[in-house]
């Protein structure tokens, strides 16, 4: 069985490696309503690493770190799902190892993170006990990367303040068929998160699942999300399979606030991508030019 498993991974690698391992930068230039004049903010976002060999190796993560730093963003956000959930792997990379590589990310206003559903789902202790912290969250905090769970922090650039907020994951707990019944599904609290914003400076919201955008008020300037992988298959602007629906499958969407959904970097279910290569997102806020995908 071990030999057959290795053969299966090898065959999959042969067929799917090119689109899975390609890496691009998706750039968006956005001017939200009421964005402060004179504040131009460059945000690099990475999402859905799903760290594992051979698809998202430590060398691959190091490449992503180097490419992200080379963009010279003002701030870096990480949008969850660092942990792999699919089974076509030769090794699940321990959290301490991938977090150690992510510690190389650097930006003047820091590196900030939220967790995704797989960071919760693959932590069996958390699922059994019904509470965190997760292994993934502890690993990030250990290397100096703050993990936001319904929290907000006031930052400033060029004398202009803004808020960076992070939502707890809305799908943190798996269905009871795998673990003991829980009375809650998520750890998200949008109201409590926004209540921590204490002035009228603009708000940027990190939320792993984009679905929350339907409830996010116009008080928020920008929501940044991952989770969907752009469907992993995307043709002519359409994703046949998207856990958050077609409207929120990928890209820049105008709702109550501007929403950018990353296509992510890793894979879920199967190591396969078509029409939506792995990407780092770079959002420039306060730039008058139109968005470029």
Walk through the language-model features, giving the residues of each:
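Membrane-embedded segments
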Residues: 36-146
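N-terminal export signals
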Residues: 1-17
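Active-site metal-binding loops of divalent metal-dependent hydrolases
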Residues: 47-51, 80-82, 117-120, 151-152, ...
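Binuclear metal-dependent hydrolase catalytic cores centered on His/Asp/Glu-rich metal-binding motifs
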Residues: 123-145, 157-203, 213, 273
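Beta-strand-turn-beta hairpins that frame and shape the catalytic cleft
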Residues: 31-44, 145-146, 152-166, 254-259
